[in-house]
């Protein structure tokens, strides 16, 4: 099996990729992908996190040698933990059930950061807060917006969270699907 870096090396900067990692590869693959996009390709990225705080991710990525100054975070975790600031290189969103608010916040982050690439971590985490039908509509709208912004994206989804039929639907909105399970 190819390494994560090899699989993503040929991805065009304006492609939308659905990435379905194995649970064991999930934690290592994200820093590898960011190293490729941020450090090698010198792209500003918007990182949408549904299940981890931006502080935790920022620390992790810094320790892995990733230029976190090129990453703007949209965090749906920290505001619920009592943090209430949108200063600097992040936006906090109170509720991952508010998909309209999430879309608006992502659009603001792309504009504010001059983001050239979006990483959405993860579509399957939205399943904890929203119905599959709402997630599917959100994903369809998000991919249309990404194309209108003329940027690329990697949308992460864990394999066991959605039925194969829904994964196939999600794949239809993307340019490529990379499944490593």
Language model features with spans:
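Glycine-rich P-loop/Walker A and Walker A-like loops and their local beta1-loop-alpha1 context
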Residues: 1-60
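Structural motif
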Residues: 18, 117-120, 154
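Short, aromatic/basic amphipathic alpha-helical patches
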Residues: 33-34, 57-66, 165-172
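Short beta-alpha junction loops
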Residues: 50-54, 77-80, 151-162
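Long, charge-dense
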Residues: 61-97
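Phosphate-binding/switch loop-helix module in NTP-utilizing enzymes
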Residues: 82-141
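Substrate-engagement module of ASCE P-loop NTPases
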Residues: 135-161
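Phosphate-binding/switch region of NTP-binding enzymes
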Residues: 151, 158-181
């Amino acid at each position: 099996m190819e390494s994560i870096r090899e699989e993503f090396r040929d991805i065009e900067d304006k492609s939308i990729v659905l990435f379905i990692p194995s649970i064991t590869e999930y934690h290592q693959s994200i820093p590898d992908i960011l190293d490729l996009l941020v450090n090698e390709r010198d792209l500003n990225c918007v990182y949408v996190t549904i299940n981890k705080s931006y502080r935790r991710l920022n620390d992790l990525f810094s320790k892995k040698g990733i230029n976190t100054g090129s990453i703007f975070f949209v965090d749906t975790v920290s505001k619920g933990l009592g943090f209430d600031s949108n200063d600097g290189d992040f936006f906090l969103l109170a509720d991952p059930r508010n998909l309209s608010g999430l879309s608006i916040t992502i659009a603001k982050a792309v504009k504010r950061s001059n983001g050239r690439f979006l990483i959405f971590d993860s579509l399957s985490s939205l399943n904890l807060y929203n119905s599959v039908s709402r997630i599917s509509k959100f994903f369809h709208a998000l991919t249309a917006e990404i194309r209108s912004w003329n940027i690329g994206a990697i949308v992460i989804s864990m394999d066991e969270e959605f039925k194969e039929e829904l994964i196939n639907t999600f794949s239809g909105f993307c340019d490529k699907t990379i499944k490593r399970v």
